[in-house]
Amino acid sequence: MNIIQQLEKEQFDKLSATKTIPEFGPGDTVIVNVKVVEGERTRVQAYEGVCIGRSGGGLNESFTVRKISYGEGVERVFPVMSPMIDSIKVVRRGKVRRAKLYYLRNLRGKSARIVEKKTDRAAATS
């Protein structure tokens, strides 16, 4: 392990001790609470959309969230370990067969929906 990998591992361990990141993947609908700085004030803004892909690993890992805002598609890339991310919450799990859902860019309306993943009833009740 070279020096850069060792430093990245130390930073990753330090950041992951303070931050809790849920397990989510492509197709999942997530709410990302982002810290927004306006002048001297800092506020938290919620960004809800479908995760269309994850890339990278360790400190360099990022994910792309797509939402439709006023009829226009908006995509935003978030680094997982960014200090600007306050929290990540998974709203619903999607059932998809691809790692990257770039085909959603060409779909509109009902065809852009993602089927919800069924969970075990025994696991859900306990």
Curated annotation (Swiss-Prot):
<comment type="similarity">
    <text>Belongs to the bacterial ribosomal protein bL19 family.</text>
</comment>
<keyword id="KW-0689">Ribosomal protein</keyword>
<dbReference type="Pfam" id="PF01245">
    <property type="entry name" value="Ribosomal_L19"/>
</dbReference>
<comment type="function">
    <text>This protein is located at the 30S-50S ribosomal subunit interface and may play a role in the structure and function of the aminoacyl-tRNA binding site.</text>
</comment>
<dbReference type="GO" id="GO:0006412">
    <property type="term" value="P:translation"/>
</dbReference>
<dbReference type="GO" id="GO:0022625">
    <property type="term" value="C:cytosolic large ribosomal subunit"/>
</dbReference>
<keyword id="KW-0687">Ribonucleoprotein</keyword>
<dbReference type="InterPro" id="IPR038657">
    <property type="entry name" value="Ribosomal_bL19_sf"/>
</dbReference>
<dbReference type="InterPro" id="IPR008991">
    <property type="entry name" value="Translation_prot_SH3-like_sf"/>
</dbReference>
<dbReference type="InterPro" id="IPR018257">
    <property type="entry name" value="Ribosomal_bL19_CS"/>
</dbReference>
<dbReference type="GO" id="GO:0003735">
    <property type="term" value="F:structural constituent of ribosome"/>
</dbReference>
<dbReference type="InterPro" id="IPR001857">
    <property type="entry name" value="Ribosomal_bL19"/>
</dbReference>
<protein>
    <recommendedName>
        <fullName>Large ribosomal subunit protein bL19</fullName>
    </recommendedName>
</protein>
